[in-house]
Amino acid sequence: MGLIAFLILIGVLVWVHEFGHFLMAKLFRVKVEIFSIGFGPPIFRRQWGETVYQIAALPLGGYVKLYGEEENVHDPRAFSTKKPWQKILIALGGPLFNFLFTILVFALVYTAGVEVPKYLKEPVVVGYVQRDSIAQKIGIKPGDKIIKINGYEVRTWEDLRDALIRLSLDGVKETTLFLERNGEVLHLTIKVPNVQKGEELGIAPLVKPVVGGVKKGSPADQVGIKPGDLILEVNGKKINTWYELVEEVRKSQGKAIKLKILRNGKMIEKELIPAKDPKTGTYFIGLFPKTETVVEKKPFGEALASAVNRTWELTVLTLKTIAGLITGKVSFQTLGGPIAIAQIAGQAAQSGFIPYLVMMAFISLQLGIFNLIPLPILDGGLILLFAIEWLRGRPLPEKFKEYWQRVGLAIIITLTIFVFINDILRLLR
């Protein structure tokens, strides 16, 4: 499932990107010799008109080969005869279409309707405070309502989540949080959790300990716990929230626990031994909470505006992440390559068509931004070269261009090897 979802995703996104270059080239009457999805030997090849369309064996990218791109040809249909500003627009076509595709997909998703957890759209009323968390250390309590953080108005849990991500990516270490408690407004100084390292504020909405799903083969599944069960006690201790259940399971350190459960008006008890997650080292029993969801639908005009806004927000977050990688605030271990993308694609596809589309739109945006980085071989590097030629009023020396391409190839190969190693290490952890 993951491989098929990955191949479809890569195929669509590469087609979108290369089609942008293709259309821009046609706009300026440049002959396109080859339109390829993938690299290496072709497994499908067909010529229509003056262009050969092909699917190649290695599905990790694609290209359009333009007439006169690699050598100076004195022909009005050749890329080499075009003005620098025209070359810039042809190079810009791919990333531009990635951005437009992202906006279009988001608009269609918002029009069709997005299913989101209901609590994300609700006010930030604290239902649970994690032990030894940032929130507990500064005195946040259940029942507190967070209304503002660092000047950002917080109306919903979604607002709080986005604000914390922005602050973390901006490198803010401490900030002021405003909350309402018993009719009073309090302001607290908090440490901003580092989202890149997986840190959290340590609060959650009130989620009742009602079972929404059971992982197949898990300890809970083996003893017959079912969706709809209400967990009342763990080892004789009453619990009121899902997070208390999680905390008690983790505290068990693998020792047997007893659960008191309400099922269809009857009290039952189950005894089970929590399993240890080899990746995180924490104990679990394989239960998922029952989460209420709402479907958000918007008219197409409103959906389009929301799509543009969401694309802009994600672009800013991505640029901040890139800046964090350069300054060292974000670890390079967070980078993922084809293996990670295949895993994510498979998970999204299993979640449904809409989550898969959202994930595809997000990766399309990443692809567009990545290609605009002014590195040799990438579209951004070509745009930089053409801009320099425009300012100089004459082409750059061929030897410089060759050296520029070699440097770019070395950088891309190094980065590719790095993300592959990262992916493999992530699988082993």
UniProtKB/Swiss-Prot annotation:
SUPFAM superfamilies: PDZ domain-like (SSF50156). Belongs to the peptidase M50B family. Pfam families: PDZ_2 (PF13180), PDZ_6 (PF17820), Peptidase_M50 (PF02163). This is Putative zinc metalloprotease aq_1964. Its cofactor is Zn(2+). SMART domains: PDZ (SM00228). Zn(2+) binds at H17, H21. Keywords: Cell inner membrane, Cell membrane, Hydrolase, Membrane, Metal-binding, Metalloprotease, Protease, Transmembrane, Transmembrane helix, Zinc. Its main location: membrane.
